[in-house]
């Protein structure tokens, strides 16, 4: 299973990413890093820097990744 975490570089999002990865889940993170920090993103997560309001950007991530579920922070 692959879960997309929107806002996965923020405090709550990054902790969620760590918990998911510890459970063996494949994680993809999108964050614009306005309030999040790249250092907070788990090294096993695939990270995309961008704004979720940019439909073309989000579509490109969804085209590239096989996402089963989304968590939005």
Question: Language-model features: where?
Answer:
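N-terminal Rossmann-like NAD(P)+-binding domain of SDR-like oxidoreductases, especially those catalyzing
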Residues: 1-73
């Amino acid at each position: 299973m692959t879960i997309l975490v929107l806002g996965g570089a923020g405090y709550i999002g990054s902790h969620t990413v760590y918990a998911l990865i510890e459970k063996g889940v494949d994680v993809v993170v999108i964050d614009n890093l306005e309030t999040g920090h790249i250092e907070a993103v788990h090294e096993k997560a695939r990270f995309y820097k961008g704004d979720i309001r940019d439909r073309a950007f989000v579509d490109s991530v969804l085209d590239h990744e096989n996402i089963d579920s989304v968590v939005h922070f």
